[in-house]
């Protein structure tokens, strides 16, 4: 059994492994980690937000942190090889790789990387994320980047998949207006609060997704000190854009599509200019049940 007695704490009550400071992302880039309940639309949100930043003239890098490696396919219009798979091919001798082996250009110049992950039941997702950032630094691929977006697996907030929080300035939480999504969001708020003790990451806000209304999200925000930064209703064009393997900015400019595009552009502008770090105060599980009307 592995001992945890001598491990440095990484947030109260945590035995997460501290990130090597040598693989931090350079100061100057805006680094955003996108979290949320599994299947809530994080990859769609991340890719469209990356596209929006690029429309504002920013150099953008999106890093998919999911073994499914499907974060960036609406940007690249294909499934790209993962960093971990490519490293395995060269027996982890990263010096043998070229940037074109693992980094791919997508819509409007957005650069795309899929970190991938270890086989099911083995390894650690945090290690893979760390190796990805290390590889990007070794090839000097972060030096001229304005915005980095980490699109992170599900609502997992263990030491592994919480690793992107150690690089991020802000975390955006994608949620729907339902109990399960908000319950997952509360757990993520707890993880961010723990990470903020030792790292620069702060809560940037909430993205309401696939929801006509936001009344339950608003209740939660009011109790916990969060703020909704963008609201994307259940617009069919967003679903169809994913089926077409493209971003919302490549869809026919109908009234609904233009409205969604403008909301993404507004979110990107606010993250660049107006975002205020939030001091989130997570609720206990029972408090969420009571808040959202369960007996």
Swiss-Prot record:
Amino-acid positions noted as binding [4Fe-4S] cluster in the UniProt annotation, renumbered to this chain: 124, 158
GO molecular function, one term: oxidoreductase activity, acting on iron-sulfur proteins as donors
Catalytic activity: chlorophyllide a + oxidized 2[4Fe-4S]-[ferredoxin] + 2 ADP + 2 phosphate = protochlorophyllide a + reduced 2[4Fe-4S]-[ferredoxin] + 2 ATP + 2 H2O
PROSITE patterns assigned: NIFH_FRXC_1 (PS00746), NIFH_FRXC_2 (PS00692), NIFH_FRXC_3 (PS51026)
Cofactor remark: Binds 1 [4Fe-4S] cluster per dimer.
InterPro entries linked: NifH/chlL_CS, NifH/frxC, P-loop_NTPase, Protochlorophyllide_ATP-bd
Involved pathway(s): Porphyrin-containing compound metabolism; chlorophyll biosynthesis (light-independent)
Annotated keywords: 4Fe-4S, ATP-binding, Chlorophyll biosynthesis, Iron, Iron-sulfur, Magnesium, Metal-binding, Nucleotide-binding, Oxidoreductase, Photosynthesis
Binding, Mg(2+): 43
Record GO biological process: light-independent chlorophyll biosynthetic process; photosynthesis, dark reaction
Residues the entry annotates as binding ATP: 39-44, 68, 209-210
The EC number(s) this enzyme carries: 1.3.7.7
One Pfam match: Fer4_NifH
Family membership: Belongs to the NifH/BchL/ChlL family.
Subunit architecture: Homodimer. Protochlorophyllide reductase is composed of three subunits; ChlL, ChlN and ChlB.
Function, as annotated: Component of the dark-operative protochlorophyllide reductase (DPOR) that uses Mg-ATP and reduced ferredoxin to reduce ring D of protochlorophyllide (Pchlide) to form chlorophyllide a (Chlide). This reaction is light-independent. The L component serves as a unique electron donor to the NB-component of the complex, and binds Mg-ATP.
Protein name per UniProt: Light-independent protochlorophyllide reductase iron-sulfur ATP-binding protein
Biological source species: Prochlorococcus marinus (strain MIT 9301)
Lineage: Bacteria, Bacillati, Cyanobacteriota, Cyanophyceae, Synechococcales
